[in-house]
Amino acid sequence: MTIKTPGTPVSKMDRTPAVTPGGSSRSREEKIVVTVRLRPMNKRELLAKDQVAWECVNDHTIVSKPQVQERLHHQSSFTFDKVFGPESLTENVYEDGVKNVALSALMGINATIFAYGQTSSGKTYTMRGVTEKAVNDIYNHIIKTPERDFTIKISGLEIYNENVRDLLNSDSGRALKLLDDPEKGTVVEKLVEETANNDNHLRHLISICEAQRQVGETALNDTSSRSHQIIRLTIQSTHRENSDCVRSYMASLNFVDLAGSERASQSQADGTRLREGCHINLSLMTLTTVIRKLSVGKRSGHIPYRDSKLTRILQHSLGGNARTAIICTLSPALAHVEQSRNTLYFANRAKEVTNNAHVNMVVSDKQLVKHLQKEVARLEAERRTPGPSTEKDFKIQQMEMEIGELRRQRDDAQIQLEELRQKLQGDQQQNKGLNPFESPDPPVRKCLSYSVAVTPSSENKTLNRNERARKTTMRQSMIRQSSTAPFTLMHEIRKLEHLQEQLGEEATKALEVLQKEVACHRLGNQDAAQTIAKLQAEIREMRTVKPSAMLKEVGDVIAPNKSVSANLKEEITRLHSQGSTIANLEEQLESVQKSIDKLVMSLPSNISAGDETPKTKNHHHQSKKKKLLPLTPSSASNRQNFLKSPCSPLSASRQVLDCDAENKAPQENNSSAARGATTPQGSEKETPQKGEESGDVSSREGTPGYRRSSSVNMKKMQQMFQNAAEENVRSIRAYVTELKERVAKLQYQKQLLVCQVLELEANDGAGYSVENEENTIMEDEEQNQVAWHITFIEERQQIIELWHVCHVSIIHRTQFYLLFKGDQADQIYMEVELRRLTWLEQHLAEVGNATPARNCDESVVSLSSSIKALRREREFLAKRVNSRLTPEEREELYMKWDVPLEGKQRKLQFVNKLWTDPYDSRHVQESAEIVAKLVGFCESGNISKEMFELNFAVPSDKRQWNIGWDNISNLLHL
């Protein structure tokens, strides 16, 4: 289980508590570190005298030179985290650019280092140096940190044509699937992960991954990377001391060497290289789209991570939980200024992308259980005993005191109000029987003392001043007070009532606040109880769950010779004279093809089931004959026919599997056609005989029975004509196909000889002659032999690889491999075979696995038919193991070729291992020797290279498709 927590220094690791499940973890936002490296001019650019288009003005800025600013709206200056010029070393790029990102994996933070740029800009060169420096620093850190145990695991993969391949297990040869894991994200199924024992072992594993990567040659780079390579180091560190704290870090460090973007017009790629470039550009376009959308900051919009397997695997490194550094490599040449500017635009976008990296800590199950138990105990203790008063408690106490004071003031006010009411009632009762002018002094004095209208001291002063006016004054004051006393009392009562209402409202508010606080305390206790219950349930689950375990340049050197030149000129003259013949033959073939199409369209389409049965049986009988094997131990004549050169792709395997197809097929076709033609002719002859034997024919011509029998005879004749016509159409179509093939080969031979004659004439016109070269002919021959030997080895290796790709007959491979050893006379055979295989590879790529329709064009070759023919050929060779090899030889070969001694179908297993590795010359040699022994090439002494004469001449045993139907032959004009 992985828990995400903030980064913690190693020195404080033991004091860092683990993060509780479900708790939030802080993450550190950080932008992608972008550096740019400008490489020096290479040899191609120096030879082409290209100009320098970019220069580094300082450590952070790169600018384009003024002469290359074609348009004003182009940005000419770019600023990045670090810029390295042509003189900088890879060590400087690592130290100042990506070292901090790489070493963060030792602290539990995921890290990724990209190398991005166009083809031949120096990405692979830079990544190799960066990887080497990172490995050194990782193991130096391990040595300096003895208090922790480190485990380093490595895995490698490449994305080739959108297929994921394991670089550490290249023997599997199959594409790996991508799976979605809820915790880990996108993972690669069945990806091999090796544990590195030390730094040398880790370097050895990295070198294996680099050696297994797909590399090809283009016009811009001799060793161009044709796939994206990802090398991942998984680093886990654990504290040696036993501690209850979280003490295990786990992080991954990715070294991503991207394939370079390229333009087909500059790389001159075609075929396989063109397809590879298309896949590379598509994945890089998806990466650019992801970077562009992340740089805008609109995380709510859709980001197409799943449009490419590259972005899907590296999703966490692009805006996720990782620190990322991108090294953009540039070519300074003016010829690549547009691609370099696009790379800088990409880097400008990438530096705006923000990642959220955090430390990844791992906790074992036992430690997690202990931690959860402590949390439960702590929460229960807090529930039982309240903690110290907090700020809320202090506020509650203040509010309670205010409420008590307000209640006391309210009670005092109520008491005073009651006293006033009682006194007022008493005064009213006394004043009912008395004159208000003679009322006594004390009540008035008491009311005056409360109302604070007249004080006793003022009365005494008044009496002392004028004792004589005492009665008058007292009377006036009595009258004044008696009239104002009720109004004053009512005003005071209203004031007290208003004060009482205010006090009541304040007390009610205080009570409501107190009730809310009490309710919050109750809810807090309920939440704590629920949390404790959840934690206890998790502990019970953790206790029950147990812990779970994870093309070379080829030089054709033809020595000028008068006799050779004369022979070639005669041959080319003959071929020019045959040009009209070939053209006439092609026109004739076109007319035949049109006639066949017309004939097929004129045939009736509705055939009854009873009429189809004989044709089906006949076809089934012929297909059974075709499946017979041609070689038997006692057949010597068949063996020579069997060794005949193929005239079309994969015809060697057809010769092995078709029963004497080239020698006996015409007789079989004639016999089967004769049977198909005899039936209608015989029936035409038998019909009048039956009519003569039956008696009066002329007397019955007008009867209904005679009309019915004649209609039946006409139907039979039509059906028989249809069957024979269909047989002729099939035979004609096969013959026309053979003629087209031979015409194409004649044209090829003509072009080849024309090229040779033109080359000789050019040499003669330049002043070369046999007499002038007699002095240096020995030296030229030696040089030619050495050059031809090198060319022969390279061409033979290409032929062997194309044999493997096109699933060519292994008997044909053995014949060709054993006959041609590198003589000068072998040159034309090697060139023709190489061109034939190149055409076959393109043809198979266009056709694919499509299976040709029966009885239409059996010469069409598809990939599935080639594999099927090769499998039948291996089964045939497996049957000859017992008859051609002694028991001792068989056992020795079984042990040598790793065939289990007690397994089933050991002969077939042994044969299936032959001709399977085109890159191992020893394997190819031994396979050819074994196949030759099984077939019997070694026993026949008349095998020569003329058997591979490419069948330029029309064979004498062509099929006799004309089986006697004059009307059809006249129709086709043949």
Curated annotation (Swiss-Prot):
Residues 683-693 have a biased composition (Basic and acidic residues). Residues 616-628 have a biased composition (Basic residues). One of its GO terms (cellular component) is microtubule. One of its GO terms (biological process) is embryo sac cellularization. Residues 1-29, 605-649, 663-713 are annotated as: Disordered. Residues 31-353 form the Kinesin motor domain. ATP binds at G117, Q118, T119, S120, S121, G122, K123, T124. Disruption phenotype: Growth defects, dwarf plants with small, humped cotyledons and leaves. Development arrested at the vegetative stage without production of reproductive organs. This is Kinesin-like protein KIN-7A. It comes from Arabidopsis thaliana (Mouse-ear cress).
